[in-house]
Amino acid sequence: MSTNIEQLKEDSNEDEYYLGTSKKHHKIKYPTSYRVLVFTTIISCLISIFLLYKFYKIYNSSNFLNLSEARFSVREYSQKQIEPEKINALLRVAQLSPTAANKQPQKIYIITKEEDKQKLKIVTRYTFDAPMFFLVCCDKNKAWKHKTEDYYSTEIDGSIVATNIILEAHDLGLGSVIVRSFQTQKLKELFKLPENIVPIVLLPIGYPKENTKPSENHFKRKDIKDMVEYL
């Protein structure tokens, strides 16, 4: 009798897992070491999955080469409105763009009004009916100037800013294309731009139309050996 009582006490001190729903259950007893092993294995797997996910996100979000290969000039746009947060992201990369001596002479005019779009059509035929345009300019008074030559960094600084914008646009699912074929002086007159503001490029921006594809010419790239020469 005493032996049975002692056995019952030992059973009550152990964790028990029951299978089935009938009154007569089947007892499966797992030692503590086994349960700890299972628990730590599960935690390790979850941590590994989390780290792999983070690595995947970091790698794919920062793979500049893939982004450069995937981007192409878009010349057909839908009229879907661009979300404010995406516009802000484009402006943020424009703000972060490198400029000569960090003078930051960039000035961006955002064109969305229909009357202003009609003005653009007067100075260029390359508007592609985009819902929005970034007119990337530089302030000549703020740009870096060469000490001994009559040279300002406006063109280069503005081009760097524009490049960053079109790459970010593609990363956000938007499309863009660089337009430089416009009447500079006429554009300045129509938009009443100050004399010190130098228009660099016009960027149509928007969601590409469905099934928009890069032109065949986009894939024609010079061989690197024809582009590079070691001195």
Predicted regions and their residues:
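Acidic, surface-exposed loops and disordered segments
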Residues: S2-L231
